[in-house]
């Protein structure tokens, strides 16, 4: 980090260098303009300036308010008394001493403490010195007495020892012992007196210090009577309240019938019975007085029943599949902040409303010491789906065959020949844009066909077709070979584990090459039985019917090998192949029945929707009443349009079906919300990198759910770094007034695929000038959206050389300056176009023409092979041999 000088710091803070040096000097830091400033010195200067300007001043005044409510019994008219509530409000203002007064008082207190300590030490030293002197005097007197006694004994000692001498010695020893005892007693007495004296001095000092402390406190109170503590103020107020209550209370006479609880309680409710019960039960007295005419009840206790738990309460926490932080905290009887803290310790940042999955919630609860019980919120769903037929008879069923392949390879035409109907001509543009489900009766049995689109946009449709099928027929044109959607169909079949039969179509064409098809398919793992593989190859022609019978026989043979079986009787189950919103009939779903028999009037649970089957139709539009396994059928009566690929199940109870559908919808919303609540940080950085991106807003409506998904995926794939497709609304059904209003508000294009706008929507379109477009072929829709996105791209500019002139001579003009006499060697020289001057094929100047003349006449252009005079604006260094290049900038439209 580079050092900061005073001059640089002054520039940063917007002050003059002299002023900053002066402020440093006032803060006790000597600096010059060229000196460096450390972070510590900056902080020191900042603290000084804050203190000088009062930035860290604390509040010096505080006001406390207290309110107490009591009840006073007042005699009224007619000898009756009434209760009057008395409210007492008290207000105290506490003012903090200023710093000077506080410092002065603190210094005085410190001096008093030092003085007291010095006096105590002095008294202790005096007592110790006196005790020491007394002890030394006693020892000296004892030694002198012993010496005198010894000298006396030695002088009076006779030469021979007699009995009298022994008696004298004994008496002398007794005397000495008595003297020693007297000396010891005297020494003990003197020591005790010295200790008493020291104790007396200490007590006097303590008494004197207490008096001085009392005097100091009185002096402080006299200085400022507001200086006190909130505890003392509250205690004084409580004492005053208690004295006032005692003065206004009369003693209660003892009850005549003390054993009667009812009388005792009634007496306690009278005004004269307040004295004995005390302050804690005044509320009971007021309640009794307010309800004189009602039956008396036992006085309730004012004590709360809560006891502080001795240990952490460990509860059993029931956790579902998803739970929010607030809900988990409520179940654990703790604050949500505790869970947030715990998850921060575990390395995860969450908010109080964030949804946690079951595993994360279990870890948090167990970490905090609770017992976790995992529950399944979809228990009702499992019960409803499990409440079906038990042991039922299994019978063989017809195979479900999906026809897949590249676009225009003849899938639908092949199915046409089998069904003896012209289906392909009915599809817009001659291409299939829906999943068509049909069943045909042959001599050897029934076969159900699913015809999937071959266009690249319908990947999801083909995946659903492969999922619901038993056998896949891969149609490959003999004259075209393997194409991208052919490879994709092979991948779908392998992913689903479905056997594959290859139908080599268009075998009647002269350019057909079946061997090339076999060779190309072998590179993708599809080997012919002729080459030792497992896949059946059949050469067919949808035009003249060649090989159709062999294909049907191969399908039935493969189905016999697979031993396809299903429950024929009982409650039906199937899969939604396609769905749409019909304006006259409502939500319509094409369901392929996989087991059981679907009957009119059954309760169907289908994904997020449910309903009673009001009507059933086959693929030809004829009304039917029931449909068995492997039969495609259109059903009416659902609550909404289900998604293609949802499972359709017949249940017993409509109420439970509605509950399961609502639960699924709520779960879908929760999952969507949890997906939206993911960390925004990555999105923020991604948006910063993207910069300004053009957006093409679309409101998309289609006739069926599958086409809607395919179109939306294809349009989203067109997005680039510069232009993005934003589908703000999508749905199945016609364009409504709501769609038109939304498109007008968001400046979007309304796109209808095989649907139309109603009258109200057309009015909004006309009044708001909304761009409304109808399409029936997906190719056209994608191409036009791509063209619209291309128009939003920033254009590119290219410079094109339109003329070249060579300088043959240079003339001087008094008005313009140097005039170059030139010969046009290439193209045309235009007066309005920019130029470059080249010398030895190097650009030395770029500018514009000031004049262009031919024979003294101003002209707008000069063509190839003609002479002219050229005056270059703001440039006079034109020489013979230079070249003047004329160019123009051309805008080139970009495409995706």
From Swiss-Prot:
Q: Where does it live in the cell?
A: Cytoplasm
Give UniProt keywords alphabetically: Cytoplasm, GTP-binding, Initiation factor, Nucleotide-binding, Protein biosynthesis
Give the UniProt entry's GO cellular component terms. Answer: cytosol
Instruction: Show the coiled coil region(s).
Output: none
Please tell me where GTP binds in this chain.
405-412, 451-455, 505-508
Q: Does the keyword Metal-binding apply?
A: no
Q: State what protein this is by name.
A: Translation initiation factor IF-2
Q: Which organism is it from?
A: Shewanella pealeana (strain ATCC 700345 / ANG-SQ1)
